[in-house]
Amino acid sequence: MNRYTTMRQLGDGTYGSVLMGKSNESGELVAIKRMKRKFYSWDECMNLREVKSLKKLNHANVIKLKEVIRENDHLYFIFEYMKENLYQLMKDRNKLFPESVIRNIMYQILQGLAFIHKHGFFHRDMKPENLLCMGPELVKIADFGLARELRSQPPYTDYVSTRWYRAPEVLLRSSVYSSPIDVWAVGSIMAELYMLRPLFPGTSEVDEIFKICQVLGTPKKSDWPEGYQLASSMNFRFPQCVPINLKTLIPNASNEAIQLMTEMLNWDPKKRPTASQALKHPYFQVGQVLGPSSNHLESKQSLNKQLQPLESKPSLVEVEPKPLPDIIDQVVGQPQPKTSQQPLQPIQPPQNLSVQQPPKQQSQEKPPQTLFPSIVKNMPTKPNGTLSHKSGRRRWGQTIFKSGDSWEELEDYDFGASHSKKPSMGVFKEKRKKDSPFRLPEPVPSGSNHSTGENKSLPAVTSLKSDSELSTAPTSKQYYLKQSRYLPGVNPKKVSLIASGKEINPHTWSNQLFPKSLGPVGAELAFKRSNAGNLGSYATYNQSGYIPSFLKKEVQSAGQRIHLAPLNATASEYTWNTKTGRGQFSGRTYNPTAKNLNIVNRAQPIPSVHGRTDWVAKYGGHR
């Protein structure tokens, strides 16, 4: 006890006195209950079966038993401190409580009581003095479970108020009683909250029974046979009384409140509702948010700055947590719904939103789309090399975006962005300081020929500058030269396009443009400036004949043939990486003597000897 400093006495109860104390270590205010009975060993203390369990009970409407101390044969219980009890709260009132306040108080009492009963305890001494509170917003049950073990036989005059809340079976000296006696006490306390005076203010045990009979009426033997047996064993005869309607005594109570009190104040303990059942009564099924308000935290802190933080408040009404904003709300204004992200997935224009089908349906009804960006059929060549928004190389290379922090915006719009490509942003940011081809887009005027009518609905965040401004910049050319996979001796400007005179459908690359494919669905393709009109926006942009590096495959020993990746290849075969290096993309090897290969012929690689790779033949002759 030398760890606590006693400050003043708070009260003197039946079984001990309560002192206000302060922890010397933390400065926290506590309530110290010093038991009147002496305990000469710890075994006697531990024989109080509640002592161990009470320390484990933790509920927002139950006073926490912090510590049990035995010193000089005296037993001390250290509780958390509350500034007042419900009796003081009612005594200081000069007008009746609103029913909403009473409902809130009652709900908290029943919440704590249901918790106690659930863990095998019942209070045995429920009364307003044992309901500690911080105003009407927070109520906690105190001193439960101690009464039975610490019960002495004091004169009833020592603590008169306890009698007013005793159940009839206790008054009739029943040897078997349980948690229903607490429910009876709660019903009496509820009536007192409405009236601000006790419902059964008996002056003795016999008078208490008379007071109960005056309100509830004389019980019938058929209604409570056990009660008549108890009365006969005490040579007691119930007075003959006519019941009084509780509504007459408590006019300010609602019909639901009268019904709940009538059920809890039943002569037969078996017919009383449990605390859990009482919580489900229609009296509590209202729109009111029950439970302690947030203000009680501030009031408790203002009372004692060092006071221990309150335990979590009870969820008296199962308040449904506010759901996270729907993903639909987050993508409002986006050109298309976000699907499962796949690397290098073609982007559909916003106008195709109404006819866009799920991926499974596309695979059933249409050939697999190419990894190239969507190309509009018969798109006319733009003057001055300007592009529509469907230029693919910008998306794949991620070289244009609105601002440095708009990466998430681009990902939300699903402009070819995938999780596997995010690391490339760090590489881009490092290179921007030296030779940055990136330029922030400017808003496109409504009357500009920058885009056709079909992509006018695109958000301003996707507005891009014309290609002529980007492709002619020296830094851009240097950057793309570094990023591309040009090989010595291969001039991509001299290659031609296969089937250049055929019409292009963005969904039928595999069967209209390339009747004879080298792979299962794919084909090879080379670009030239002379073919710009035939290939629409992509070839117009690709003036240098550059083939995007992620669509290349190096074939045979020295990359002598440049092939496009198979159109049906899985995305996992093409790991996104902006750094240049050889052997980056692995895939099947194609026959270099196949038809329709209008690429500069090179010498065939020297076959390996005995399964070993001839590195000189592979690299030495071309580097």
From Swiss-Prot:
State any GO CC term: nucleoplasm
Choose any GO biological process term that the UniProt entry carries and state it: protein phosphorylation
Per the annotation, which location comes first and is thus the protein's main one?
nucleus
Query: Which residue stretches does the UniProt record annotate as biased composition, category Low complexity?
Result: 356-369
The cofactor(s) it depends on are: Mg(2+)
- Which residue windows does the record flag with biased composition (Polar residues)? 446-455
Reactions catalysed: L-seryl-[protein] + ATP = O-phospho-L-seryl-[protein] + ADP + H(+); L-threonyl-[protein] + ATP = O-phospho-L-threonyl-[protein] + ADP + H(+)
Name the domain of life. Answer: Eukaryota
State the tissue distribution. Expressed in prostate cancer cell lines at generally higher levels than in normal prostate epithelial cell lines. Isoform 1 is expressed in kidney, testis, lung, trachea, and retina. Isoform 2 is retina-specific where it is expressed in rod and cone photoreceptors.
| UniProt-recorded Gene Ontology molecular function terms | ATP binding; metal ion binding; protein kinase activity; protein serine kinase activity; protein serine/threonine kinase activity; transcription coactivator activity
Q: How does it assemble?
A: Interacts with RP1. Interacts with AR and CDK20. Found in a complex containing MAK, AR and NCOA3. Interacts with FZR1 (via WD repeats).
Q: What does this protein do?
A: Essential for the regulation of ciliary length and required for the long-term survival of photoreceptors. Phosphorylates FZR1 in a cell cycle-dependent manner. Plays a role in the transcriptional coactivation of AR. Could play an important function in spermatogenesis. May play a role in chromosomal stability in prostate cancer cells.
Q: Which disease is it linked to?
A: Retinitis pigmentosa 62: A retinal dystrophy belonging to the group of pigmentary retinopathies. Retinitis pigmentosa is characterized by retinal pigment deposits visible on fundus examination and primary loss of rod photoreceptor cells followed by secondary loss of cone photoreceptors. Patients typically have night vision blindness and loss of midperipheral visual field. As their condition progresses, they lose their far peripheral visual field and eventually central vision as well.
* Name under which the protein is recorded: Serine/threonine-protein kinase MAK
Source organism of the structure? Homo sapiens
